[in-house]
Amino acid sequence: MATKRDYYEVLGVDKGASDDEIKKAYRKLSKKYHPDVNQEADAEEKFKKFQKPMNTLSDPQKRAAYDQYGHAGADANFGGGGAGGFGGFGGGFSDAGGFGGFEDIFESFFGGGRSADPNAPRQGDDLQYSINLTFEEAVFGKDTEVSYKRNEVCHTCGGNGAKPGTQPETCHKCKGSGTINAERQTPLGRVMTRQTCDVCHGTGKEIKEVCETCHGTGHEKKTHSVNVSVPAGVEDGQQMRLANQGEAGTNGGPYGDLYVVLYCSHETCNIFDRDGSEIYYELPINFVQAALGDEVDVPTVHGNVKLKIPAGTQTSTKFRLRGKGAPRLRGNSTGDQQVTVKIITPKNLNEEQREALRNFAELTGQSTEEQQSEGFFDKMKDAFKK
C-alpha cells in the first residue's frame, strides 16, 4: 500500500522552514512544473502533487494540525473543523456522562467526526493561471485578457442538478444529514461511528431525474475570460488574487478565487539586470574617456539620459541615476538605476597606435617592461627578507 509523502519533503524544505522559505520553494516548483511552462506529458500531474502540501503549510492553522497529527490533520474533515481549519476532537468530553462524549473521541480516531451541514453553501475551488511577462511589461505593467476553463453554475438547472420542473429530495437514508451511523470493529471492540452516506454521497439530497446538461453535478465546464491589470513593478513569482474568478460554489456558495502567477523573463532584455525596484546597467567606455572624462548617453527603461564621466574614472566605478529604476509596488516612488563602469581595453592595435602608447608610457614613467621587471624582483627580495 502506497504511503503519502511528507509535505515538507514534497516541497523540499525542513520542518522548521519559515513562511518565506516555503513560498520560495513553491515558486521554484511552480516555475519548473507548471503546465504553461513545462511541456512534458507528466508536468501537470507533478504540478498537482505539491498543491495540497502548499495549501496546508502556508496556512498557520492547517500547518499546526499537520505538524501534530500528520496527514490526518490535513484532512478538511478531521476533527469536525471542516474546510475552515482545524476543529479539535469534535466536541471532546462535553457529554462524558453518556456514550455520546466517548463516541466523539472514537470518531476522531476512526474516520468519523461530526460532519458539517451538507446543505450549507460552500465556496468553489481556487484556480491558478500563469502569465509570462517581458522585462518591460514587468517594469511598466500590462493590461491583458486571459481565458481559461472553469466550472460554472449550470444554466439549465441553476445549480441544483435536477431536471427542470423537478427538485432534489431529502435523502431517504440519512434524512438529509449526509452521514449515517455504522458499527465498526476496532482493537477496543465494536464502536459506533458516523460515515458518509452511501446513497447521497454526503450531499443529503437525492436527485430522481438529473439535469441533462450537467448530469446532476450542478456545474458545467465553460471558457471564462477576465481582464487582468498587472501593476507596474511586479517581480518574478508574485501572485495576484482575483476574487470570485475560480470554480463555482455549491448550494449557492460563492465562486472560488483565481490566483495569477507572474513569471518575469530577463531573457527579453540583454542590457539590464533587475533586483526589486533597482535596475543595473554596465557602461562600456574606452580608456581615453576614463582618463580625460566625457559625457555619454546611458540607456534606461525611461529613455536615454546624459551622464558625466569624471577624468580619472576607474573600472567598476558606480554611478546612481535617481528615479530611473522600476516603480515600487507600494507607494508612488521609483527605484534607481545603478551604472557600473567597465573600461574596454583596445585590441588589434596597428603599429602607429602601439607607438603612441609607448610614447605615452614614457611620458608618464610607466614603461611596461620596467614595471614587470621591477615588480618581479621586488617580490623576490621581499620573499628572501621574510
UniProtKB/Swiss-Prot annotation:
Its main location: cytoplasm. Binds 2 Zn(2+) ions per monomer. Zn(2+) 1 binds at C154, C157, C211, C214. CXXCXGXG motif repeats lie at residues 154-161, 171-178, 197-204, 211-218. SMART domains: DnaJ. Transmembrane segments: none annotated. One of its GO terms (biological process) is response to heat. GO terms for molecular function: ATP binding; heat shock protein binding; unfolded protein binding; zinc ion binding. It is found in: Cytoplasm. Zn(2+) 2 binds at C171, C174, C197, C200. It comes from the Bacteria. Residues 364-374 have a biased composition (Polar residues). A zinc finger (CR-type) spans 141-223. Participates actively in the response to hyperosmotic and heat shock by preventing the aggregation of stress-denatured proteins and by disaggregating proteins, also in an autonomous, DnaK-independent fashion. Unfolded proteins bind initially to DnaJ; upon interaction with the DnaJ-bound protein, DnaK hydrolyzes its bound ATP, resulting in the formation of a stable complex. GrpE releases ADP from DnaK; ATP binding to DnaK triggers the release of the substrate protein, thus completing the reaction cycle. The J domain is necessary and sufficient to stimulate DnaK ATPase activity. Zinc center 1 plays an important role in the autonomous, DnaK-independent chaperone activity of DnaJ. Zinc center 2 is essential for interaction with DnaK and for DnaJ activity. This is Chaperone protein DnaJ. It comes from Tetragenococcus halophilus (Pediococcus halophilus).
